[in-house]
Amino acid sequence: MKEYQTITEISGPLVYAEVDEAIGYDEIVEIETAQGETLRGQVLESSEGVVAIQVFEGTSGIDQNASVRFLGETMKMPVTEDLLGRVLDGSGRPIDDGPEIVPEERQDIVGAAINPYSREYPEEFIETGVSAIDGMNTLVRGQKLPIFSSSGQPHSQLAMQIARQASVPEEEEGGDDEEGSEFAVIFGAMGITAEEANEFMQDFERTGALERSVVFMNLADDPAVERTVTPRMVLTTAEYLAFEKDYHVLVILTDMTNYCEALREIGAAREEVPGRRGYPGYMYTDLAQLYERAGRIQGRDGSVTQIPILTMPGDDDTHPIPDLTGYITEGQIYVDPDLNSQGLQPPINVLPSLSRLMDDGIGEGLTREDHADVKDQMFAAYAEGEDLRDLVNIVGREALSELDNKYLDFADDFESEFVDQGFDQNRSIEETLEIGWDLLSMLPKDALNRIDEEFIEKYYREDDSDRQVVEAAD
């Protein structure tokens, strides 16, 4: 380990120092200020005898008299099963006044995407307890399914609800042994306010969800540079629990927009040529390095499933952050401002939402035999009702047919009964599908052209008058 006092420039979160030896990319650095404070950093660039160092705690207090020590290793996360139930800062240090963490091993936080040949296709259902997700845009183990929201929307409450309620259904008889069925949540918060952090922690502690969770907290007043480390700490912990301890791990990352803003800040400090809207040209690659760490590996019981949450600036889904995220991930869940203004909780708009892996994770033996048909029919009926709402504004409801009016009623009830369940209600997939059939039974049988006749006969609810006629005939 060699020590230098050769700082030449300080720019934003970056420190530049001259060196006379080869320094590795991502190497960990300690900087000791004149006041005796020790700060941690990481090498971003090394060329022609000068290295650029990003300082996690910020560059305040650093001057040209500060000492720079290169430790000769990359940043590692100390991992152990005992991390469950702990709260850490964005750099992986405990902040919950708990006992010192004794790691079983230390793993490089950079990690690597899973070898495509070794990947196992995601096919098993994860129950979030949220009908708009479980019923219409099902999440499966090993998937990466982002939530697209905008500033001021209740995505934090939705994140807490999923973290609190998410579970892996019991294996079917004859399925895998139960050792691989343990479930854990790794929650990574980046750039959130102290108020949001308090809400998260109160909810975790009130509901007991903290016992099966690891929480990483990077606050808004923490250094932006730390935000580039937090998701890698989160995913390294998730990979350890999934692939070495056989947990099914759900990773929730919020807010990825703050992460990308940190990338832009560092890029500006390095005077890089900017890409779209000032973001670095390598942002797509950087995001892919994070998102592609989700998945399953052949021969391993565990899995890593990701739900990254991002706020779309200006509610614009063509903004570089949601746009690039959409290219990499397998669908999206939309939090809709209009539905939120109507008081729906959670305000998920199912029409633009999509889970590309849903069809492989539902059906007999996974959720229920009629799930796919119910989902398709509800999508079609709700879309028809939405179109008719626009028409009603022009011609009035009296000009519509009886069937059209039923579609309008279906759309209203779909939002009020299916989507609007509140942030504290946990619905099983059975309850979700039963509510779906209650709604579809508002429509005549001959309108259910996307559902198999066998399922209609088994699940369709006759109205009261029809039941009375049948009972009288009996």
Curated annotation (Swiss-Prot):
- Give the location in the cell: Cell membrane
How does it associate, per the subunit comment? Has multiple subunits with at least A(3), B(3), C, D, E, F, H, I and proteolipid K(x).
Under which name does UniProt file this protein?
A-type ATP synthase subunit B
Q: Which SUPFAM superfamilies match?
A: C-terminal domain of alpha and beta subunits of F1 ATP synthase (SSF47917), P-loop containing nucleoside triphosphate hydrolases (SSF52540)
Q: Which family does it belong to?
A: Belongs to the ATPase alpha/beta chains family.
Q: How does it sit in the membrane?
A: Peripheral membrane protein
What Gene3D superfamilies does this protein's entry cite?
3.40.50.12240
Q: Which GO terms describe its biological process?
A: proton motive force-driven plasma membrane ATP synthesis
Query: Keywords in UniProt for this one?
Result: ATP synthesis, Cell membrane, Hydrogen ion transport, Ion transport, Membrane, Transport
Q: Which cysteines are joined by disulfide bonds?
A: none
InterPro entries linked to this entry:
ATP-synt_VA_C (IPR055190), ATPase_a/bsu_AS (IPR020003), ATPase_F1/V1/A1_a/bsu_N (IPR004100), ATPase_F1/V1/A1_a/bsu_nucl-bd (IPR000194), P-loop_NTPase (IPR027417), V-ATPase_su_B/beta (IPR022879)
Primary location group: membrane
